[in-house]
Amino acid sequence: MHSEMLLHSVKADLHEKQEQIHQLKRVLHEIRQIKHDFSEAQHLIHRPHLNREAWRGTHAERFEDIREGMNKAYQQIKSDQVSGIIESIEGKIHSLEGDVYSIRRQITRIEHEIEKEKHKK
């Protein structure tokens, strides 16, 4: 009886880990899509295009400096922050998949133990 209760508990743990993996994979897909959309919008920083003949002087230089700062910030967010989040989620998924593998092995051992107990009776 103890083994059957343990089996039920371990199967519940397995289901919980699998659900966590499913949710993380869904979120990972959404974040990757957002990163793609974010990358697609980066070119808008340089709009409207202002040529040097029509746009010059102190304000023009300051405006271009602001644009360049925005471009660098975009790159940092995309490459450092978002990529870091993606790597973190991928690491957690990998860890949970390892847990699932271990839990499945544990379930197999418990099921064998239950079979042994049944044959003893």
UniProtKB/Swiss-Prot annotation:
Protein name listed in UniProt: Protein YxiB
Species this chain originates from: Bacillus subtilis (strain 168)
Phenotype caused by lack of the gene: Deletion of the yxiB-yxiC-yxiD-yxxD-yxxE operon has no visible growth phenotype, however it is out-competed by wild-type cells.
Top-level taxon in the UniProt lineage: Bacteria
